[in-house]
Amino acid sequence: MKQFMLAGVSSGVGKTTVTLGILKALADRGYQVQPYKIGPDYIDTAYHSRITKRPSRNVDSFMIPDDQSLAWSYYKWHGDADVAVVEGVMGLFDGLGTDKDCASSASVAKKLGIPVVLIIDGKATSTSAAAMVHGFATFDPDLDIAGVIINRVASQTHFELIKGAIERYTDVEVLGYLPKNATAELPSRHLGLIPDVEMDDLDRRFEDLGAATAKHINLDRLLEKAELPDKRMTNPFRISNDQPLTLAYALDDAFHFYYEDNLDFLRELNVQLVPFSPLKDKELPAADAYYFGGGFPEVYAQELMANADFRASVKKAHEQGRPIYAECGGLMYLGELLEVEGQVYEMVGIFKGKSLMTPGLKSFGYCQAETQVDSLFGPKGTAVRGHEFHHSVFETEEDTVLKLEKVRDGQVVAAWTGGYQKGRTFASYLHVHFYQDEQLLANWLDYIKEAN
């Protein structure tokens, strides 16, 4: 089995570009490629899936702190694949705080036992690149740095200069490069790359990127260095559900942030998933419960407001006591109002208050939460790990039901409250991965059964 991680020396070096190019080039060769993403990102995984035609999976060691559960989130999915490609997050050793082994790409690579290919930015550098590679290669002797790929290289001559320096001063093999004009830069906005569903020319960009990758990166050598013994493991989770349930979930251009593992976990527990569109459908489908994931309701605020019949059906389901769970963009939709650039749009109105878009991030990163009331997560005092990433605030006088903290290097660096519960509707900015604790999902299913 061929497995490797692509990790940058920092954010912004072109790690995602290189990853997409390699995914495309390998897929063009006929390989079945299983992609993964370290950390909580939803958008990169959608790009991976677009190329490989396989759902990309998040491998997140903060939200999934148990090593067995973390390994399951990785090994479960590539048994029928030829190659597993893992895209790192931020810089190789960047994680939570200053501990290089806390939620970093490096720590996950060591836990999984896979080699790392380092991505560096070749723009305006030559021999200094060797010092950078040397530092990364020697910083953690337990980490296998199998090679380096140089991004944004000006010319073949420039590549030979950097390659010569790295191979003169380090033992790390240079596997190739991408030229600075390999493809037009992928556009982004406040939450990172623009989602693939909003890109009209994405497949053409992928074709260009795949061709440049095949031309300039030694894929044969990369795959040689990535060959590892097959490893299989058994499912560490023990929960079960004998009662068939139906969960309808929002899935369209406005709402599409879901962890694939969460959806598959639900399916494995006898839950039928039914997608619906708050943009296009006239009413909610019949279901035992409803799930509104994150996304970009602010981009589609006019269309969401215009679909008044659908909004009314959501509020009716709430009033009838149907369990509703919403994360981030889902919270914004279930609120009363959404303000974008001075324009105010009516939303569902389950929670009184207004979501207001902000110029900067209002919350970013991992956090630990504790429920202050009995909820779908379980009894009061239930611990939940999650991730927040939003350019908005929810201005409301509704009571909060979560106590949240951000902890770095053992110290609480921020504390706040959030999350709202009214009847059987629960909404917060927190994105949650259920592999962290199977009991959270068991509690949610019990909560749904009690309501029905």
From Swiss-Prot:
It comes from the Bacteria. It comes from Streptococcus sanguinis (strain SK36). The gene is cbiA. The keyword S-adenosyl-L-methionine does not apply. Its cofactor is Mg(2+). Residues 246-439 form the GATase cobBQ-type domain. Comprises of two domains. The C-terminal domain contains the binding site for glutamine and catalyzes the hydrolysis of this substrate to glutamate and ammonia. The N-terminal domain is anticipated to bind ATP and cobyrinate and catalyzes the ultimate synthesis of the diamide product. The ammonia produced via the glutaminase domain is probably translocated to the adjacent domain via a molecular tunnel, where it reacts with an activated intermediate. Keywords: ATP-binding, Cobalamin biosynthesis, Glutamine amidotransferase, Ligase, Magnesium, Nucleotide-binding. It is an enzyme of class 6 (ligase). Pathway: Cofactor biosynthesis; adenosylcobalamin biosynthesis; cob(II)yrinate a,c-diamide from sirohydrochlorin (anaerobic route): step 10/10. One of its GO terms (molecular function) is ATP binding. The keyword Chaperone does not apply. The active site is at residue 328. The record marks 431 as: Increases nucleophilicity of active site Cys. Catalyzes the ATP-dependent amidation of the two carboxylate groups at positions a and c of cobyrinate, using either L-glutamine or ammonia as the nitrogen source. It catalyses: cob(II)yrinate + 2 L-glutamine + 2 ATP + 2 H2O = cob(II)yrinate a,c diamide + 2 L-glutamate + 2 ADP + 2 phosphate + 2 H(+). GO terms for biological process: cobalamin biosynthetic process. Its EC number is 6.3.5.11. Belongs to the CobB/CbiA family. The a and c carboxylates of cobyrinate are activated for nucleophilic attack via formation of a phosphorylated intermediate by ATP. CbiA catalyzes first the amidation of the c-carboxylate, and then that of the a-carboxylate. It holds the Pfam family CbiA. InterPro entries: CbiA/CobB_synth (IPR004484), Class_I_gatase-like (IPR029062), CobQ/CobB/MinD/ParA_Nub-bd_dom (IPR002586), GATase_3 (IPR011698), P-loop_NTPase (IPR027417). This is Cobyrinate a,c-diamide synthase. SUPFAM superfamilies: Class I glutamine amidotransferase-like, P-loop containing nucleoside triphosphate hydrolases.
